[in-house]
Every structure is written in C-alpha cells, then in structure tokens.
Amino acid sequence: MDDMYRDYILDHYKNPRNFGELEGATHTYHDSNPLCGDEMTMQLKIGDGHVDDVHFVGKGCAISQASASILTEEVKGKTLDEVKAIDRDHVLANLGIPISPARIKCALLGLKALKGAAWGLTAWPGEEVKAK
C-alpha cells in the first residue's frame, strides 16, 4: 500500500471528520456489518434538496471509519440526487488503495448508510431494520 494513501486513511480514522451526533438531523440511517462488528449511523440535515450538514457515529475498523469520514466531507452541499448517484467504484477510488474482497463491506458501509439516509429508508429491501 502506498504510504501516502495509508497515511490518508489513518488520518481519517484517527481524526474522523464530521464524527458525532448531528443536532436537527432530518434523515438518519443505521447499518452494521455483522461479519466484522462494524456499526454506523449516518445523519443528514437536508435543506432545499441539498445536504446542509452530515455527521456519522459508529465504531469499526480503519477502513470503514475512514471511508465514512471521507464521504461526509465530499457530500456537503451536494443535492440528494448527487448523493444517491455515488457508487461503490467512486468510494473505492477515493480510498486510493486496493481493498481485498474480505474488506469490501467495510469500505462500503458508510456509503450504504449514507444512501439509506438519503433515500429515507428504515431498511434496505430484503433486510430487517437494524437496531442501534
């Protein structure tokens, strides 16, 4: 792994951006990865169809937490449609490192929670509502 990208991920893991409860959140979604124990709640404050603010809370590995931190920085000011259009390839490219198949769910947990919040879901189709 390139040192620059490793440092980038470790920085976002150790100093996550937009971490903590978001007062006045209008859209919230909680998700988890039962295979590794990662958990995450993504909270959005939407105004006039745009993301005015975004925070996340949770616990997990460096990849899941860094990925969520990077996403929160990226989506502020975007429209809900722009947020809904973000895909896995975009998230994986933003991490800048190869992600093993065993860690894909870790890397994409933040995206899944972000999109769940953006869509106003309580659970993805075919999944049970996850308790916080």
Residue positions per predicted region:
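Alpha-helical support elements that line or immediately flank enzyme active sites
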Residues: S67-K78
